[in-house]
Amino acid sequence: MYIIMGVFTTIVNIASFYILVEIMNVDYKAATVAAWILSVLFAYITNKLYVFQQKTHDLQSLLKELTAFFSVRVLSLGIDLGMMIILVGQFNTNETLAKILDNAVIVVVNYVASKWLVFKKTKEEGV
């Protein structure tokens, strides 16, 4: 299920980036950050509901989980933006192609971080 939701999240990221850069003429760095925000929101919802099937029973737990998810994903933003600056800024790679390449790395980083840091099961949940 993670792969399916990861594909959808990647599509959200690349499509929003493409629209911002190619249609709205937004700078690729700003578009990278905006696409990251949209895709992280999408990823949180789909990971919570469909991948890790986490149930949150109170607002405090939800906010803690959401904060952890976004905090961990800041690492992916750094990787995303860094790769875009290197690929586009240094190697003159097409912006959309660079976004596709960097998403391949981001999917792996995000899965590991989500599984082990955000949606980890506690002893009470059977682990």
Swiss-Prot record:
Record membrane topology: Multi-pass membrane protein
Transmembrane segments: 1-21, 32-52, 68-88, 100-120
Annotated compartments: Cell membrane
One example of a Gene Ontology biological process annotation: polysaccharide biosynthetic process
Signal sequence extent: none
Keywords, in A-Z order: Cell membrane, Membrane, Transmembrane, Transmembrane helix
A GO cellular component annotation in the UniProt record: plasma membrane
Record has Transcription regulation as a keyword: no
Keyword Aminoacyl-tRNA synthetase: no
Family in the record: Belongs to the GtrA family.
Name of this protein: Uncharacterized membrane protein YwcD
The species this protein was found in: Bacillus subtilis (strain 168)
